[in-house]
Each structure stands twice: as C-alpha cells, then as structure tokens.
C-alpha cells in the first residue's frame, strides 16, 4: 500500500471536513472553503479530528489514488487553516509589477502592458515593483497562477532577465565569443 496513503490527516481545530455522495469532499476553515471530487477507488472516514483514506481494493490504481487523495486532502486542510504563499521575482531593466484589486499589471518589455486577471480565491501583493507575493487557500490554483505569470517572460539563460520563482536557480550561459 502507498506509504503516503497510510498516514492519517490530522484536522486542526476550526477545520471541518464533510464527505458527500460521490466522494465529494468539502473542507471548511477560517480562510476559505474548498471542495473537490475524488476517485471512487478510495473511501474517506473522519473521526476524532483525524481523516483516513483507504483504497477500496488492492489494485495498483486504487493504492495510487489513496496516496494522491491523502496528499490533496492534507493540502486542502493546510490551505483553509493557514493558507499558501508563492513569491515571484522580476529581474530586468524596466520590468515592473503592480497589483490593482483583482488584477496584476505587468510591464515586461513588451510594447504593451500585460494585465493578468487573478482568479477568485487568489490575492496578489507587490511590496516592491520587482516582487510579487501570491496568496490563496488552494495550492493547485496558486501554483497554476504563478506558472501562468512566469510564462509571460521566462528567465533567459544569458542575463537572467524575466519572471522567476523566488527560490528558482537559473543556470547562466556564457555568450559566444568571436
């Protein structure tokens, strides 16, 4: 059986988990409410502030789904209680970002500013013009948004200009010499 799937998910105080028909799980907390439909190969049980996921049979797929479901449920519980944060850095002359409500204005060297509309549940802060802090309860959506913003101008390998994750290392190349 999956090693991750065997571990129970500890539910902190202030967080409730409801399992509806069709394996639709809803997690409510102080920061948000998240819901997700899981595979029917797994069964959820919640008792005494602990949630456990068990595969319905011993097939390879059911065991794999139990580990996946446990990891996703753990992220949902952490998201509604603490929330997640992703930091992006912008490197380059004239490259800037500015958060305005649910939009992010990016100046990335194009002939026009890029306006990225943030999805519901994700907020952006720009403490400095070259820093973006994305916050949200849904880890999957937060990663998707950060990836889409990075896609506008990926870090290039010669000068390192572009949008990168805060902890990302960009291997630099040496320019060709004549």
UniProtKB/Swiss-Prot annotation:
One Pfam family per UniProt: Ribosomal_L6
S-adenosyl-L-methionine in keyword set: no
Record-level Gene Ontology MF annotations: rRNA binding; structural constituent of ribosome
Gene3D superfamilies xref list: Ribosomal protein L6, alpha-beta domain
Organism superkingdom: Bacteria
Alphabetical keyword list: Ribonucleoprotein, Ribosomal protein, RNA-binding, rRNA-binding
InterPro entries attached to this UniProt entry: Ribosomal_uL6-like, Ribosomal_uL6-like_a/b-dom_sf, Ribosomal_uL6_a/b-dom, Ribosomal_uL6_bac-type, Ribosomal_uL6_CS
Family: Belongs to the universal ribosomal protein uL6 family.
UniProt xrefs under HAMAP family: Ribosomal_uL6_B
Described function: This protein binds to the 23S rRNA, and is important in its secondary structure. It is located near the subunit interface in the base of the L7/L12 stalk, and near the tRNA binding site of the peptidyltransferase center.
Protein name as catalogued: Large ribosomal subunit protein uL6
Organism: Francisella tularensis subsp. mediasiatica (strain FSC147)
Gene name of the record: rplF
């Amino acid at each position: 059986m999956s090693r991750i799937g065997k571990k129970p998910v500890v539910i902190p105080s202030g967080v409730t988990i409801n399992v509806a028909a069709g394996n639709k799980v809803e997690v409510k907390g102080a920061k948000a409410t998240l819901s997700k439909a899981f595979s029917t190969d797994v069964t959820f049980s919640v008792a005494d502030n602990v949630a456990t996921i068990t595969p319905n049979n011993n097939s390879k797929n059911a065991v794999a789904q139990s580990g996946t479901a446990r990891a996703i449920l753990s992220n949902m519980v952490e998201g509604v209680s603490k929330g997640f944060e992703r930091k992006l850095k912008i490197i380059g002359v004239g490259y800037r970002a500015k958060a305005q409500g649910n939009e992010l204005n990016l100046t990335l060297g194009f002939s026009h500013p890029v306006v990225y509309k943030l999805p519901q549940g994700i907020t952006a802060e720009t403490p400095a013009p070259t820093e973006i802090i994305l916050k949200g309860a849904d880890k999957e959506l937060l990663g998707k948004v950060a990836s889409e913003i990075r896609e506008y101008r990926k870090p290039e390998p010669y000068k390192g200009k572009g949008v990168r994750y805060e902890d990302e290392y960009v291997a630099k190349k040496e320019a060709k010499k004549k």
